[in-house]
Every structure is written in C-alpha cells, then in structure tokens.
C-alpha cells in the first residue's frame, strides 16, 4: 500500500495528529445539496469550523436502500433543490479549496458511480479533491472494478465491516480498504432510533489483528457518550449521520437556528473524542 499511489495521505495525517493528542475523530455525514446547494456549503463550514475532523458526504439518490427515513428525507430535499451529480462535484471542489488538509469521503450508491462510467466518476472525484469513496451497496467481494478505478485515481476505497462479519470477511475488508474502515455498530438501516449497542470490541480487535485501516464506528451515533464509548472500545473515531441530518430537517426553514444548533452539536460530539 504505497502512499504515492493513493490519496490516503490526509486520513493518515489526521489520524496521526489525533493519536498524538490522545483523541479520536468526529466525522459528520450530510447529503450534498440538503436543503439547498447554498445552505449545504454553510452547513459544511459550520461542521468543520466547530471541530469535525473529516467529512462524509452523500450524493442525493432517490432510492437509498440502506438509509432510514431521516437520510431519505435529506436525499429528497436535495433532489427537490435541483442538486445534480455535477453540482455535487462543484460543491466538493469548493470545500476542498477552502480546507486543503481536511479528509473528504463520499458515501453513495453504485448506480451513481455507474451512471457515466466507473472510471469517469473516480476521475471527477479526484479532480474535485475527494480522498475516499464508500459504495454502500457493493460488498467487498464484488468491489474489484470500483477499487481498481479508485486506486487508479489516487482515491481510497472504503469498506464496511458489518457487526455479523466472519473473520474471512474482516480479513478481506482489512486488506482491501484504505484510508479508514467503516465499522457498523449494528446491521440494518441508518438512523438514531436504535442506539448503537453491539459489542464492537471483538470486531475491533480482529480488525487490529488484520492490520485494517483505522476503524470509524457508524450507525446510530447520536450523542457524545456514544462517541466516547466507541473510542474507548478501540475505534479511531465515530461517524454521525442521521443525528446531524435530523438537525437540518428540523431547522431547514430557519438558517440561523440550523447553523447554531449544528455548531453546538458538533462541538459537543467533538468534545467527547
């Protein structure tokens, strides 16, 4: 795994810096263009300026299989605002220009990658300054065409380590992934209703044995105590999606309140790392 070939440098630098500080990463997820492209940029600014260590960003998609109603709502709002993949790449380029050292990951579905050809998608992502891509509906066993295109464009392929995975799958995830490992705290759809509760220590110790990229715990991370628990269990940090998007949903018509609430939430989650 040569750093000259892949763009995992920003992740490595971020994780190394956090490790030196004895902290973990707080990584929020939002859908690009939710509730509008203009406000989406202000939301991203608010997240970064209040302590987000990296970003996980989605492209709006009308049929998100793995997502609960909160993130589906984000997709629909973004699409209603006219957010296209081209608009998403433009937003990404703006974020990258503003935050040259921030790790930026995409979390999306295979259809969006297939739409204009796999290679063309990764070429655009590279041009926009993207560090990693996680394709939610492509398991590691079927990921070769995506991984090859990603690596050809210096982008880290990210894989999900499911809570019910056997050692063979975890070994494959560890060997195939770069940047970070997305560790699911439970199987199912995203959301904050069921609190993250699967004992992850066992999976974390296996990932460590297999020398996996740093694991970030996601799914159901909605409060600071869960961030602390994830890091205490051995995760390199935590990803929070539905809880962040819920704030956008609640205050979508009141920009000042939305950004203030989001800032408070981000600071509280980061403080728990």
Swiss-Prot record:
Annotated GO MF terms: tryptophan synthase activity
Enzyme active site: 56, 67
Keyword hit for Lyase: yes
EC number: 4.2.1.20
Pfam families in UniProt: Trp_syntA
Catalytic activity annotation: (1S,2R)-1-C-(indol-3-yl)glycerol 3-phosphate + L-serine = D-glyceraldehyde 3-phosphate + L-tryptophan + H2O
Domain of life: Bacteria
Any one GO CC term of the record: cytosol
This protein's record includes keyword Lyase: yes
Pathway where this protein functions: Amino-acid biosynthesis; L-tryptophan biosynthesis; L-tryptophan from chorismate: step 5/5
PROSITE patterns associated with the record: TRP_SYNTHASE_ALPHA (PS00167)
Enzyme class of the recorded protein, top EC level: lyase
Keywords attached to this entry: Amino-acid biosynthesis, Aromatic amino acid biosynthesis, Lyase, Tryptophan biosynthesis
Assembly information from the UniProt record: Tetramer of two alpha and two beta chains.
PANTHER family: TRYPTOPHAN SYNTHASE ALPHA CHAIN, CHLOROPLASTIC (PTHR43406:SF1), TRYPTOPHAN SYNTHASE, ALPHA CHAIN (PTHR43406)
HAMAP family tied to this protein: Trp_synth_alpha
Annotated family: Belongs to the TrpA family.
Protein function: The alpha subunit is responsible for the aldol cleavage of indoleglycerol phosphate to indole and glyceraldehyde 3-phosphate.
Name of the protein described by the UniProt record: Tryptophan synthase alpha chain
Source organism per UniProt: Shewanella baltica (strain OS155 / ATCC BAA-1091)
Underlying gene: trpA
